[in-house]
Structures are given as C-alpha cells and as structure tokens.
C-alpha cells in the first residue's frame, strides 16, 4: 500500500486501515504526501473519508474515489458522532494535534476509536495520555521500531477540551509598512518571527514594487470540497 518514501507512522495507519470497518476519517497533513490512494479502497464494510490541509493530497484521494475535503482542518461540514474511527498521524505543531484530537471527540460515535501514530520526539506518548483523559480511556502506545501507535476509545463527550490556542483564529503578528501581517496556530512557528520570516518582511515592500498592480488575491484553504 505504501510507496518508498511514505512516512513510517503513516504506514502504520495504512496497515490498521486495512482491518478497520465502518465509517473512517483520515486526517492527513504533509506526512501523507506519497501515499498511493489508488490502493486505499472503500469496501462494503468500510467507507473512507479524508480531510487534508494539502491540496495535492486531497486531490489525489478524491481522484481515487475517496470523499475528500481540502481545508485548514475545518471539521464543521462533517456530521457529529458519525464516525467509527478517526486516523491521525500527529502533527509537528502542538496546537494542530490538540485541535484534531478535540474534534475527533465530537466526530466519533461513543465507543469509536481515535488511532494515533508518531515518533517519541513528536510527543506521541503525551498526546495519547491527553486523548485518553479527554475520551475517558486508558490507552497506551505500542512501539514499532522508532514509531508508536495507540488506539484511544471514546467513552465520554463532555470533558474539557485540550488547549488548541484558538486554532481557527488568525491574529496579527507584526505590522510592515502599514500592513498588518497575520498568522495562526497550525503554521509551524506561528507565534514567533524567525530570521527567514524577518528577512521576508523586511524586503516585502521591494518585492511588491515589482508589480504594476499589487497582488490582491490568495488561495483561501478554509473551505474547499473536492
């Protein structure tokens, strides 16, 4: 099912998906870039849906016949308590992982399962503990080489949510030449300005001077269904 460069934690989820039944939701970020979606199939006993913040991933999945959504992990179009399984390879950014785990609690039916994978350095064990507390479960991570997999079962839906830094909300980070530049959780390093970003901001006026008309549009990934 996996191509040569598929992330090993993603490969664990793909293996689990093969034996998973019911209504399944895959939450896919850049780690899923090299998956051959043509080999990830719906069956009479399994219906696969995908939500991704990467257009290429959502498009590939949609082309393979999978119900796919391209947006910034906006789950509002999905019916609450309608999934038996949610599969998520934890993200680089903590707020993103918390946001997905929180939403999984609302999307899963009671006794449904959130399947988490990642490496130790990704904080996988911490996320499993947090999800277990949120879900009212006592799950543990199983080791597979340098990667871990855990299955957290939903027993409650009224526990306090994890801190996702108000994930959906953009906020100003700096003003450049009278222009307020925005960022948000989910963008790695969103709450600080690194040297590369500072360089970009410093030279933004010169960049815009190249245009006879300044750019006025961008691709908005908030809600795009394939």
Predicted feature locations:
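A short glycine-rich, Lys/Arg-flanked "PGG" loop and its adjoining helix->strand segment in the class I
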Residues: 98-113
